[in-house]
Regions:
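Gly/Ser/Thr/Ala-enriched C-terminal appendages of enzymes
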Residues: 162-167, 172, 180-333
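Generic beta-strand/beta-sheet core signal
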Residues: 86, 116-118, 148-151, 175-177, ...
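Buried, small/hydrophobic-residue-enriched core segments of structured protein domains
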Residues: 1-167, 183-184
Length: 333
């Protein structure tokens, strides 16, 4: 940001608010995407989000990170994100008969018949779905799938898959939800549980195990004079800068170099002007375009950085030119 100090500081809080939160959520969501190993992951987190705007931005950030869609209808309307949803436990409980609840739901939502089958007993409910399916088929309604939301999901999925297959519903998919995060997703995928897709809520939309990101916005130059903080534990590098990214011969990320603006380094420059005098220099990219770019960049992470635990830190280097500038600034302040 290059601007008079009052203007630069007027936008500081909102820029930090948007970047901190969505970067944090997108990072958490990307870990779930990697753990799911190609199986769709859906945002179910609005009810546990820290406020309405946070829920909407979490839906956006998770979609950018690779989620298949969201259960937040307003996010779908605002951002063009695919909307997913099933039925509620309350709908089942409002009926005196579980099978009747399933049938009424199918009649009301004939194009999205995904039954929530854990209100009482999953295996019993799965058999009710099998018994109901021929009657629905006679009315051109197909069972799209079932959702499991509690208990030992791997064990329940195997038992339910067996019941559905024996009942002729081999095409019905199993969606799993219930306190999922990247670690549980990884365990379920590694166990080869017959689960086709996942819904992730609380852990993602609150980034429960890493609920903050200490991103900062600091003055680096004033009236052409480079400057920096030297506060203990909070020192910054001075001057306008550029970041260059280098890849391995195999196309994977190798390292970044942070340097002064005019110190050309090997690799691709990452910082580009987006606005001038308050006007965008180009149209904002479409959300799906951003999502594709994120997928490309995630695919370039080396295996050592794709691990859920004991992940290797990315190599970020400070150029000699930037170190020399910092020394010069320190001598004069």
């Amino acid at each position: 940001v290059v601007a008079p100090i009052p203007m630069a500081q007027l936008v500081e809080t909102r820029i930090m608010n948007l970047l901190n939160f969505q970067t944090m959520i997108a990072s958490k969501a990307a870990r779930s995407v990697l753990a799911a190993q190609g199986k769709p992951v859906i945002d179910f987190g609005l009810r546990r989000a820290h406020g309405a705007e946070a829920g909407l931005l979490a839906a956006r950030a998770s979609y950018v990170a690779g989620f298949a869609g969201t259960a937040t209808v307003l996010a779908g309307m605002q951002y063009g994100i695919p909307i997913y949803g099933t039925m509620a436990h309350a709908f089942v409980q409002a009926h005196t008969d579980e099978a009747a609840a399933f049938e009424h739901f199918a009649q009301a939502q004939p194009d999205n018949v995904v039954f929530l089958i854990d209100t009482y007993d999953m295996e019993t409910a799965a058999r009710k779905v099998v018994a109901l399916a021929p009657r629905l088929k006679a009315n051109d309604i197909s069972v799209k799938g079932v959702r499991l939301d509690s208990g030992d999901l791997a064990d329940h999925a195997r038992k339910v898959r067996h019941i559905l297959d024996d009942g002729g519903l081999r095409d019905a998919q199993i969606l799993a939800s219930g306190n999922l995060d990247e670690y549980r997703l990884n365990t379920l995928v590694q166990s080869r549980a017959p689960i086709d897709s996942f819904a992730v809520g609380t852990a993602m939309t609150t980034s429960s195990d890493a609920p903050s990101l200490d991103c900062a916005y600091k003055l680096q130059e004033y009236a052409g004079r480079p400057c920096r903080k030297r506060s203990e534990g909070k020192a910054t590098w001075p001057g306008r800068r550029q970041v260059y990214r280098t890849y391995t011969d195999g196309g994977y990320l190798d390292h970044d170099v942070v340097t002064t603006l005019n110190d050309r380094q090997a690799g691709n420059p990452l910082l580009h002007s987006a606005m001038k005098e308050g006007r965008p220099l180009a149209p904002a990219p479409a959300l799906d375009g951003i999502r594709k770019q994120v997928a490309i960049q995630l695919s370039k992470l080396p295996d050592s950085m794709r691990q859920l635990e004991e992940c290797t830190a990315y190599d970020v280097r400070i150029s000699q030119a930037l170190r020399d500038l910092a020394d010069s600034v320190d001598r004069h302040t």
